[in-house]
């Protein structure tokens, strides 16, 4: 059933804050469930679903992101995307299907505590977690703890991976516009060539990690797109660099940004041009609560047959970090065993992982949500 839900959602990927079909699909499914314990709110294109417990002392939050990516799908599956230039290439279709599976179980098999299911838009950009967290709708239903997962193509089905503390990096988009003076290729001395300026800037940016960041820290600066020029015999008046910054600490992020700004000022002087920097969307690090994460890992090892890997931190960016900065909780990787990675046009995760995740999470939230009962019975 939830594999079919995943396939339905896979066919209708939508970009951030445009998830209208996705939102309606989830609302239509929720309407088929018994409503006695359900409360539903919408926030922009997101959804909050509160499942009331039998004798709540806390609220357990579970977050699933909803948006797709601007990628042309290149798989040959019969349920491939029907939206041209859009694809669920980061597994958010699976995230939603798993959340609905857990939600359905809790509705039919109530636990003591309340649960809040958060279907969050715009994880890929411009970022939905922070504004959703600050919304009146969520403030009224703020959970006491929160958890989430992310699919991991590199891990086999039946495996999850996580760790206490830092799991994902601080990330920031990076956009730099250079403005010079165009002209005929035969008269370069009368121009200010922004292709040359951009080339120099890209090379200088690479020295930040190697010469300005402590080798014991971690940072990555990637320029993934360079746009400049019109035709081969015209010197480019403008250039635009687009990329990302990733660091394992907020302090390193500030240092990297400071060096970028200093280098860009030097480019302005050296190439007699103007430059503008925009950092775009910025995501805070995913930092797992040590007590809750350790408790979860012990539960997985003792109470399930799921294989647990204690992984290292990754340079991945996730706006779930904003939620973890305010609500204790954790995130983990779910193995889906795909030869193609996240954000790849041929990503094809193994759907058997959906049932693995639903069974694991329903057992965990049932244990966690009834934990007070067990303590009182001792």
UniProtKB/Swiss-Prot annotation:
Keywords: Amino-acid biosynthesis, Diaminopimelate biosynthesis, Hydrolase, Lysine biosynthesis. Transmembrane segments: none annotated. GO terms for biological process: diaminopimelate biosynthetic process; lysine biosynthetic process via diaminopimelate. Its EC number is 3.5.1.47. InterPro entries: AcetylDAP_deacetylase, Amidohydrolase, Bact_exopeptidase_dim_dom, Peptidase_M20, Peptidase_M20_dimer. Signal peptide: none annotated. Catalyzes the conversion of N-acetyl-diaminopimelate to diaminopimelate and acetate. PANTHER family: N-ACETYLDIAMINOPIMELATE DEACETYLASE (PTHR11014:SF98), PEPTIDASE M20 FAMILY MEMBER (PTHR11014). Belongs to the peptidase M20A family. N-acetyldiaminopimelate deacetylase subfamily. HAMAP family: DapEL. This is N-acetyldiaminopimelate deacetylase. It comes from Anoxybacillus flavithermus (strain DSM 21510 / WK1).
């Amino acid at each position: 059933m939830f594999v079919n839900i995943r396939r339905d959602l896979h066919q209708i990927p939508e970009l951030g804050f445009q998830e209208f079909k996705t939102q309606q699909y989830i609302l239509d499914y929720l309407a088929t469930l018994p409503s006695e314990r359900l409360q539903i709110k919408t926030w922009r294109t997101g959804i909050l679903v509160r499942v009331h417990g039998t004798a709540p002392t806390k609220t357990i939050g579970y977050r699933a992101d909803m948006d797709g990516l601007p990628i042309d799908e290149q798989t040959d599956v019969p349920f491939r995307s029907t939206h041209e230039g859009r694809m669920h290439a980061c597994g958010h279709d699976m995230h939603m299907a798993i959340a609905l599976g857990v939600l359905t179980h809790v509705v039919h098999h109530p636990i003591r505590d309340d649960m809040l299911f958060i279907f969050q838009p715009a994880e890929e950009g411009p970022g939905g977690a922070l504004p959703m967290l600050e919304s009146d709708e969520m403030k009224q239903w703020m959970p006491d703890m929160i958890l989430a997962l992310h699919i991991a193509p590199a891990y086999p089905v039946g495996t999850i991976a996580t760790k206490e503390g830092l799991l994902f990096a601080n990330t920031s988009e990076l956009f730099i516009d250079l403005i010079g003076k165009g002209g005929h290729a035969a008269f370069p001395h009368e121009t200010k060539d922004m292709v040359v300026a951009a080339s120099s800037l890209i090379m200088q940016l690479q020295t930040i990690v190697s010469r300005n960041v402590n080798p014991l820290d971690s940072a990555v600066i990637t320029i993934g797109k360079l746009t400049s020029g019109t035709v081969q015999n015209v010197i480019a008046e403008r250039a635009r660099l687009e990329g990302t910054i990733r660091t394992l600490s907020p302090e390193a992020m500030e240092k990297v940004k400071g060096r970028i700004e200093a280098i860009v000022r030097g480019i302005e002087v050296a190439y007699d041009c103007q430059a503008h920097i925009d950092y775009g969307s910025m995501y805070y690090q995913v930092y797992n609560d040590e007590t809750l994460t350790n408790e979860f890992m012990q539960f997985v090892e003792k109470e399930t047959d799921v294989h647990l890997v204690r992984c290292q931190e990754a340079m991945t960016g996730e706006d779930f970090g904003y939620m973890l900065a305010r609500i204790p909780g954790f995130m983990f990787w779910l193995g889906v065993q795909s030869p193609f990675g996240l954000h790849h046009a041929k990503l094809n995760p193994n759907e058997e992982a959906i049932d693995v995740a639903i069974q694991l999470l329903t057992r965990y939230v049932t244990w966690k949500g009834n934990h007070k009962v067990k303590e009182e019975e001792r």
